[in-house]
Amino acid sequence: MGGVGEPGPREGPAQPGAPLPTFCWEQIRAHDQPGDKWLVIERRVYDISRWAQRHPGGSRLIGHHGAEDATDAFRAFHQDLNFVRKFLQPLLIGELAPEEPSQDGPLNAQLVEDFRALHQAAEDMKLFDASPTFFAFLLGHILAMEVLAWLLIYLLGPGWVPSALAAFILAISQAQSWCLQHDLGHASIFKKSWWNHVAQKFVMGQLKGFSAHWWNFRHFQHHAKPNIFHKDPDVTVAPVFLLGESSVEYGKKKRRYLPYNQQHLYFFLIGPPLLTLVNFEVENLAYMLVCMQWADLLWAASFYARFFLSYLPFYGVPGVLLFFVAVRVLESHWFVWITQMNHIPKEIGHEKHRDWVSSQLAATCNVEPSLFTNWFSGHLNFQIEHHLFPRMPRHNYSRVAPLVKSLCAKHGLSYEVKPFLTALVDIVRSLKKSGDIWLDAYLHQ
């Protein structure tokens, strides 16, 4: 093994049949810079520096695991591991030295081992196999609501009451479409990735007017590094809102771009109403243009063409624009409350390089299940199970939950489950707490 701090081989991948060079973690830690990234998977060391831009999930996603053991993330995100390993082989430059632990940083080796055994048990129980009937029903009820909304206006006219009912129904349809495209993005429905990708483009593009690539770019980072600043886009929201550790940091630096001690109040004005209508619409369009996602742009255009051609004859241009805004605002409320109730009240801060299980549990909690909550949240009330097993079809979360709860009990880890309304209120409480922490640091530190 080379001396500590030596950069290791850079001339190319390990030669087939030749003994693999060995590395210690101190050497690997030196390779977590832009343009110089190593990572470890199954104790093998890979140089992804030049290949990261070709990574299907994006260079940021794989780069977030620089100089880390990415074994559990690798297994969590990919369907066909043997197929993906073919792409890793040319990047192989060595392996961990025998005396090195499998993971750098805070590590509970027994927890990692037990989780991998649990993952295998879930596979043996066929919990990664989707129910075609379940997902066909989901798509069917989305399409039925789209038709029902149009029929209301067609049969009853564009009065205030039919329009309000139609907007409400379309908002539900849009919310459920978020859930279905989310399932497809995680490749949890079809056995072949290609079919998941194609179906996601249809649901995200034709039914919602957004880019599947854009969603996956954001969402996979969130799953890889939940609640980690500058790695999880969902919590990198300063200077509009301050969350977790950013509250103290902004306070100490005397930054006051907004009255953060009142952020739990202005959240109701610019959070739930405007996220989808303003932030997502602008960010999504910019992503498609900058990243030249022309196919996604065409899919999104097909949604707008269908929507406006369907309702323009009833409302005219000003009316159909107002109707569209109403649907987006209603949908946005659903999206914010449902997606944030499991994360915002949890630990939010900078990278701590934890193992997969510990990092996911620190950032997530569950909400008590019921038929309504399961449907309304797209089963995101089982957020712990979803984050540990992102490819698992959501109808199987309840089956794996007792096993996850037992794992947490064995290792003294928190398995938090809240009532639905408590989870919603905790979002506001968390924002107020962060604002108060900012104010105290601003005035006294």
Curated annotation (Swiss-Prot):
Membrane association type: Multi-pass membrane protein
Motif (Histidine box-1): 182-186
Transmembrane segments: 134-154, 160-180, 264-284, 307-327
Expression tissues: Highly expressed in various organs and tissues including liver, kidney, brain, lung, pancreas, testis, ovary and skeletal muscle (at protein level).
Catalytic reaction annotation: an N-acylsphing-4-enine + 2 Fe(II)-[cytochrome b5] + O2 + 2 H(+) = an N-acyl-sphinga-4E,14Z-dienine + 2 Fe(III)-[cytochrome b5] + 2 H2O; N-(hexanoyl)sphing-4-enine + 2 Fe(II)-[cytochrome b5] + O2 + 2 H(+) = N-hexanoyl-sphinga-4E,14Z-dienine + 2 Fe(III)-[cytochrome b5] + 2 H2O; sphing-4-enine + 2 Fe(II)-[cytochrome b5] + O2 + 2 H(+) = sphinga-4E,14Z-dienine + 2 Fe(III)-[cytochrome b5] + 2 H2O; (11E)-octadecenoyl-CoA + 2 Fe(II)-[cytochrome b5] + O2 + 2 H(+) = (11E,13Z)-octadecadienoyl-CoA + 2 Fe(III)-[cytochrome b5] + 2 H2O
Cellular compartments per GO CC: endoplasmic reticulum membrane; membrane
Protein name in UniProt: Fatty acid desaturase 3
The organism's taxonomic lineage, starting at the top: Eukaryota, Metazoa, Chordata, Craniata, Vertebrata
Gene field: FADS3
